[in-house]
Amino acid sequence: MREIVHLQTGQCGNQIGAAFWQTISGEHGLDGSGVYNGSSDLQLERMNVYFNEASGNKYVPRAVLVDLEPGTMDAVRAGPFGQLFRPDNFVFGQSGAGNNWAKGHYTEGAELVDQVVDVVRREAEGCDCLQGFQITHSLGGGTGAGMGTLLISKIREEFPDRMMATFSVVPSPKVSDTVVEPYNATLSVHQLVEHSDETFCIDNEALYDICMRTLKLSNPSYGDLNHLVSAVMSGVTTCLRFPGQLNSDLRKLAVNMVPFPRLHFFMVGFAPLTSRGAHSFRAVSVPELTQQMFDPKNMMAASDFRNGRYLTCSAIFRGKVSMKEVEDQMRNIQSKNQTYFVEWIPNNIQTALCSIPPRGLKMSSTFIGNSTSIQELFKRVGDQFTAMFRRKAFLHWYTGEGMDEMEFTEAESNMNDLVSEYQQYQDASISEGEEEYLEEEEPLEHEE
């Protein structure tokens, strides 16, 4: 069956990854050590998308955990689901990348990468029909950004025809974890544009906003944020893991979502999001899910789609949902918000339906949008990059690891190109071709 091999790199990637495995294990009825004690055959039916069956009714995630320092992995191992993972699949160095992209991509990470690729190869050989890879990482640090992108390109070399999806935590507009974040992020985007098939952009600030505004948590922890991300990650692959009336998988998603190969950076959202106290006061219906999932406040990346237009979207519904109702709602959304959808891709919302809802909910929906407004995010990082790079601030950390300034310049211009490509398609309209045609004809009228 269509297996997915999961990689998590760096501190952020490992923490999101751990939350994801917790969510997935719950959905499939596994306890913290991978033993099945679920209630329904449906949970077992396609368990092998993410899990290998070992002896004694134990299931082992197809996950590879990577970091350049042992700290985060020790925490994962000590956590509630630490006994789930195969011990050989923890690959870590001792030195750390110290938020330095060059260390992750060229020096420290490069020493460790072959070891990781061996583990990935072994996982891939254990699959009947490997569908692709998913990787969780952040773009602002050293290991997740530098080594994460190195891994992506190595895996790309070895498995050129398999899907590569990344869940990438992009730098937030106002909150920055490290000063050199703009450098690391720009160098990473430079890699992702070329080597990833679909990148789901998530940022902490947007997640904080959702936690505070919608979930009414007064001081959200990273645990709360990661829980949100894991809900989306689970939603994206739900069709692979449970039966549904309208299936979707990583490849179908990419075919429907990526009109031009470089423009594969998606915004994601999840519904229903309600504060813990308000659960019992709301009935969740398809119109309400649709309303909420197209709400800018629900997007997990800090760019407002009202400033751009959707090239394509995908909506994945879970639970007992009527197909007709979903189609009506989608048509409704499209006709009401015509200005936010490009008119030169006529039916640009893809829907998928899966009959099994997530734990504790009657129905839910996952939203994935390819909006031109994501350029705001790249523009913001690009501006910060330019400000520092003009003065060559902090560059010695990177050149000291053997990087060339040229590479910075290339990454910068690649990101600027990406921004202007998004802008170009945002401004494009159906009638452009026709207008030129009319201009040629006009002079004839005046001669009469």
UniProtKB/Swiss-Prot annotation:
Gene3D superfamilies: Helix hairpin bin, Tubulin/FtsZ, C-terminal domain, Tubulin/FtsZ, GTPase domain. GTP binds at Q11, E69, S138, G142, T143, G144, N204, N226. Its main location: cytoplasm. The keyword Lyase does not apply. It is found in: Cytoplasm, Cytoskeleton. Mg(2+) binds at E69. Residues 432-448 have a biased composition (Acidic residues). One of its GO terms (biological process) is microtubule-based process. GO terms for cellular component: cytoplasm; microtubule. One of its GO terms (molecular function) is structural constituent of cytoskeleton. Keywords: Cytoplasm, Cytoskeleton, GTP-binding, Magnesium, Metal-binding, Microtubule, Nucleotide-binding. Residues 425-448 are annotated as: Disordered. Its cofactor is Mg(2+). It holds the Pfam family Tubulin_C. Tubulin is the major constituent of microtubules, a cylinder consisting of laterally associated linear protofilaments composed of alpha- and beta-tubulin heterodimers. Microtubules grow by the addition of GTP-tubulin dimers to the microtubule end, where a stabilizing cap forms. Below the cap, tubulin dimers are in GDP-bound state, owing to GTPase activity of alpha-tubulin. Belongs to the tubulin family. Dimer of alpha and beta chains. A typical microtubule is a hollow water-filled tube with an outer diameter of 25 nm and an inner diameter of 15 nM. Alpha-beta heterodimers associate head-to-tail to form protofilaments running lengthwise along the microtubule wall with the beta-tubulin subunit facing the microtubule plus end conferring a structural polarity. Microtubules usually have 13 protofilaments but different protofilament numbers can be found in some organisms and specialized cells. This is Tubulin beta chain.
